[in-house]
Regions:
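Extracellular/luminal Protease-associated
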Residues: 95-137
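A contiguous pocket-lining binding segment that forms or flanks enzyme active sites
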Residues: 136-137, 143-191
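N-terminal low-complexity or amphipathic/hydrophobic leaders
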Residues: 14-90
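A hydrophobic, small-residue-rich beta->alpha segment in the mid-to-C-terminal subdomain
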Residues: 188-230
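Acidic/histidine-enriched, glycine/proline-rich intrinsically disordered or flexible terminal extensions
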Residues: 228-265
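Buried hydrophobic positions in well-ordered alpha/beta secondary-structure cores of metabolic enzymes
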Residues: 37, 126, 187-189
Length: 265
């Protein structure tokens, strides 16, 4: 008897992350997020080696819905496992049909890109269900379609080989490794043009606060360096530079004024 098909894979988390926090995180840069997480003692939260299949659909933030793969086995992972849904050998379909609005399907493909973790059909279905993104540390097929799909899809590369060649979906909504980073169900993933950062759920709201401030400060510092000022005394900012930043904000925060406005001594 199939005990998996039709099961509810949604998890009730102790820490709520408001939709407003998710929206704010979409505007936070990966550089600021990883720096602030490093200051909290989390030294590697960035998924190294992954890129968006469509560079125009790279920005997202959402809660992790995890999928774990193991190596395929020839007597189990045959074309017959793609029988009509539901069936116990096709948990990948279970994931796509259970993922919630605003969630990110995060796939542990063991960093193995030899066979596609998914093609364009599954991300298209996820988009229609309101999911936020799909992320794998493996590869995709249907690269030309994904390059046009207005839905964030991150992976290593494009290959044509079917998932069944090397991957079996073993479990859903369990802790996984993706691109060398631990991802737990409910963690918050943020993607921008540079890549993806994993934020422990309980730190999401704090990261939104810290990174908004950091990104604003970094933009100010880039105006000053771009105007010809040396790094020393500007970047990283000294107390005096931070005071100048506050004075610049109070004066209207115009980019052209950044090299000129200074705090009163």
């Amino acid at each position: 008897m199939d005990m998996t098909a039709g099961r509810n894979y949604q998890i009730k988390h102790e820490v709520e992350v408001p939709a407003s926090v998710i929206e704010r995180l979409k505007n936070c840069s990966s550089g600021s997020l990883t720096t602030e997480l490093f200051k909290k003692g989390l030294r590697q939260c960035f998924l190294v080696g992954l890129k968006p299949m469509n560079s125009n659909a790279a920005i997202f933030a959402g809660e992790a819905f995890t999928l774990r793969m193991i190596p395929a086995r020839e007597d189990l992972d045959t074309i017959e496992t793609l029988k009509p849904y539901p069936n116990p050998h096709n948990l990948q379909w279970e994931a796509v049909e259970n993922i919630g609005k605003g969630q990110v399907l995060v796939i542990d493909s063991r960093n193995d890109p030899r066979a596609a973790s998914a093609g364009a059909m599954l991300p298209t279905r996820m988009k229609m269900r309101g999911a936020a993104a799909i992320v794998t540390d493996g590869s995709f097929r249907d690269g030309q379609e994904l390059a046009k799909l207005e839905f964030p899809a991150y992976g290593q590369m494009v290959v044509a080989s079917t998932r069944l060649s090397y991957h079996r979906v073993a479990d859903l909504q369990v802790p996984i490794a993706c691109a060398g980073v631990a991802v737990y169900p409910g963690d918050i993933l943020v993607g921008d043009g540079d890549g993806i950062t994993v934020i422990p759920r309980h730190l999401a709201a704090e990261m939104a606060d810290l990174c908004e401030r950091r990104d604003e400060l970094e933009k100010y510092l880039s105006y000053r360096v771009g105007a010809g000022e040396p790094l020393y005394g500007v970047y990283p900012p000294t107390d005096a530079t931070r005071a100048d930043f506050a004075a610049w904000k109070a004066a209207g925060a115009k980019p052209e004024d950044a090299p000129h406005i200074r705090a009163e001594k």
